[in-house]
Amino acid sequence: LDDAQTALTGFGQGQVTATPLQIAMVSAGIANDGVVMNPQMVDAVIGNDLSVIRASENTEFGRAVDAEIADEITSAMVASVSNGAAQGARIDGVDVAGKTGTAENGNRPHTLWFTGFAPADDPAVAVAVVVENGGGQGQSGSGDTIAAPIAKKVIEAVLGR
């Protein structure tokens, strides 16, 4: 990468490619004091008598950042939801940590993102939402107005709110 491409990559543009699962892993790693875990799609396999046939084990993928850095990122993400660019994910009584993204696609509709976790001080859920084709709003939609409210609904469902 040249200097310009490196700069674009630094804020998520250019040649950055990531799946929603990978972005959810980023948020989960921040929520987990900088330690990224391997993703699991199944918590346990249950038999027809409701006994656990096989339970999944949590395994560490690796440390992405020091705990102190993860804490600083968490604070910035909470501020983004509380009074910044990600207010579409605000939930009364819950500190949500989040980050929006609006990827430009030339003259085509934007790709809208939100990733985050909650509660920020004792995380129970990490989420990533991607909405393609501008969520029906062309180039006027944003991660805050389209993707963040979807994430809010998911977080509320997980937290039973």
List where the protein language model places each region.
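Active-site beta-strand/loop architecture of penicillin-binding DD-peptidases
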Residues: 1-60, 77-161
